[in-house]
């Protein structure tokens, strides 16, 4: 068995990062807004930093729980979420703003919902 308190703490950190992503990306209407100005590039940088933190935390959760936590939630592409962190961290100059924007608009909300379900299931 794993340390439930530690897992809940990490889940809450991920939840906070996802909330920041939603807050910082909800007014973006297309990927060009992330590259067309210095402000957009700063927003892209900030979003990528949050995705790195989320991906790293997901990797830690997977290790701590021996894969059992994510196995109970197959509706999320956990491997893809963790892998996106690797792309951002190791191939930063190859980041595709279109991909970041697509993830913000299509993947963040389902991930957030899954994280909330996990928090509830663990009794927080």
Give, region by region, the residue ranges found by the protein language model:
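Solvent-exposed interaction patches of small proteins and small membrane subunits
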Residues: 1-124
């Amino acid at each position: 068995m794993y340390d439930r308190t530690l897992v809940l703490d990490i889940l809450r950190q991920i939840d906070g990062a996802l909330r920041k992503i939603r807050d910082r990306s909800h007014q973006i209407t297309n990927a060009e807004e992330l590259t067309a100005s210095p402000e957009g590039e700063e927003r892209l940088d900030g979003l990528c930093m949050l995705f790195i933190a989320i991906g790293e935390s997901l990797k830690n959760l997977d290790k701590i729980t021996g894969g059992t936590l994510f196995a109970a939630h197959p509706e999320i592409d956990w491997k893809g979420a963790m892998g996106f962190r690797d792309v951002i961290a190791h191939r930063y100059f190859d980041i595709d703003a279109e991909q970041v924007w697509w993830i913000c608009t299509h993947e963040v909300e389902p991930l957030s919902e899954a994280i909330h379900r996990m928090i509830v299931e663990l009794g927080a």
